[in-house]
Amino acid sequence: MSGLPLVQGSYKTSQDQRSLVGRISPALAFYPRIFPIIFRAGAMAKRGRYDDEAWQASSLAVARTLEKAGARLDITGLDHVASLEGPCVFIGNHMSTLETFVLPVILLPFKRITFVVKQSLIDYPVFGHVMRSRDPIAVGRINPREDLKAVMEGGAVRLGKGISLVIFPQTTRVPEFDPKEFNTIGVKLAKRADVPVIPFALKTDAWGNGRLVKDFGRIDPSRTVHFAFGAPLRVSQQGAAEHQEIIRFIVLNLKAWGGVVKE
């Protein structure tokens, strides 16, 4: 499977890769090209032919399309992922649709993964076929007790199969980070399954949240796309210290990138 070319666990868009259309209208360079990627993936998934290799290829195509629209990617810390044996729980903030599309090409070269996602994402036309094929854990974000049970039970099963979980412990994706809205569900799962946590921080508001349709907002190449992965953490006792360390990691990176953190 082909992925992003890494140098010492990092990737940076090497130069301005904007197409002619991207220089005129980033959104016009991006959306008309991303829809065929989604439709092809959905068709393959519906036929039961969408595997990890196809997922990574689709994700890479989205990343390259972003770059042609003018976006710059800056990814660091993948040496921590590469050196960790066995499955883990990836825990980070959630900002836009971008991370759902791009994280697979970042992580699949090292780990089999799936996501904890909202049930509504599973029910989407076309893209829902893609998500269901990845065997995610679906939560309603309405009943916290039911969501906790789904993540604890479903997460243990998948981790037992060697599949790592990507968890966004927030109720929704938002451009600013509020530590008070960042729950402990990922840490609890890692503790129960006895696997490490890899914290990650991201700033993906180059793909904005739309006013009418949240998934399709403004494409703003002036905002660099950042991903940073931290050193693995082993959860001890009830996980309070590790939870705070994850928050600290996210806050430090967001502030360094010029992101918004609610104090």
Residue ranges and their predicted role:
Residues M1-P87, V102:
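Membrane-anchoring hydrophobic helices of lipid-metabolizing enzymes
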Residues A29-M44, L84-N143:
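Catalytic core of membrane glycerolipid acyltransferases/transacylases, capturing the structured
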Residues R47-L78, K111-E153:
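Membrane-interfacial amphipathic helices and adjacent loop/beta segments
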Residues G77, F127-G128, S164, P175-A241:
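A cross-family acyltransferase "interaction/gating" segment
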Residues P87-V89, G162-F168:
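Residue-level preference for the first positions of well-ordered beta-strands
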Residues M95, E99, D147, D178-F182:
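Short, glycine/acidic-rich beta->alpha junctions
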Residues I106, V130, V157, K188-L189:
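Hydrophobic/aromatic ligand-binding patch that stacks against planar heteroaromatic rings
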Residues T171:
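Active-site metal-binding loops of divalent metal-dependent hydrolases
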